[in-house]
Amino acid sequence: MLAGNTAGLTLSSTLLAGVNEGGTILAVEAEHRLINGGVSFDNTQSEELGRQQGQIRAVINSPTGLGETISMFGLARPTIKGMKGTGADVPIRAGGVAISLPIGNDGLTTGISYMESMTRPGGDAIDLGLEANMKSATATVSYPLVYKRDKAVFFRGTLGWTDEIQQTNIGGEDQDLSHDRITALRFGVSLNRCLTGCLGIDLQFSRGIDIASRSLGDVGEGTPLSRSSGKNNFSHFKLDTTYAVALDKNLEFNINTGGQLSLDDLLNSEQSGITGPDKLSGFTSGSISGDESWCFRGQLNYKKKL
């Protein structure tokens, strides 16, 4: 099963007649795809961020034969000015790269990633001249505690770093409004189990640490934090659950629940939202967030061939 999860590798099997009478041979064939990717468009952004966004991604699968993956993505408003322009023509732009590498043959996987993003809201907020710039980096280790065809339990540990600056040029020059820098340790366990339906549970604990972070004591007379009571050494728990079951050949029922429980006042990047395609889809993505948030979504999907 672990071989079937090797980057870019697709396995297929068939039974053949054996050499001896009554014997059977299991033949396994493998196909490796070096590069894959895709392009997607949606309208999940707020009106201030241009509503539409486009994303392009590419994945290089095991170019050296070690099972590694190199992933890259770019996101912007899907127009020429949105991708190449400046100023108000670019309400959102982001890009990043991630590398993962399996260690040994028992499922241990390591990974690193880096991403930068910029948002510059227009619409009713354009006169405020707002802009937010974020940089983030992570290093992750994951290991399968249980890995079977109908059950998988994974443990992961992550060291993450985020730097976010919000500014305005309403006075003609860029002026910083807030500056957050957070380093966090995160530990999580995920369970996927398929019986009558398929259940997914993901629980994560996050703890902010002082290394390479910016606290209220570091502010002084300089740029404030995004929240005066926000802590860089925070603690919070996050839970996400999914359940999907086929009620009929073309009818599927899905449940998504989850939320975040915080023990401290959080800065912007650590707050949790309840909007999105798998949560409250009737609202603009990211429009509702806070230190603590909980949501429940039930959905019926009916497949109809046209």
Regions found by a protein language model. Name each.
Residues 9, 24, 33-37, 52-54, ...:
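Outer-envelope beta-barrel architecture signal
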Residues 1-45, 74-89, 93, 257:
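Periplasmic polypeptide-binding modules associated with outer-membrane biogenesis and secretion
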Residues 165-306:
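C-terminal outer-membrane beta-barrel translocator/porin domains of Gram-negative envelope proteins
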Residues 26, 56-58, 97-99, 139-141, ...:
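Membrane-embedded beta-strands of outer-membrane beta-barrel proteins
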Residues 83-191:
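Transmembrane beta-barrel wall of Gram-negative outer-membrane proteins
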Residues 5, 32-39, 66-73, 115-123, ...:
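Flexible, solvent-exposed coil segments and beta strand-coil junctions
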Residues 44-48, 75-83, 117-125, 148, ...:
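Sequence/structural signature of outer-membrane beta-barrel proteins
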Residues 15, 39-43, 70-76, 112-116, ...:
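Transmembrane beta-barrel strands of outer-membrane/channel proteins
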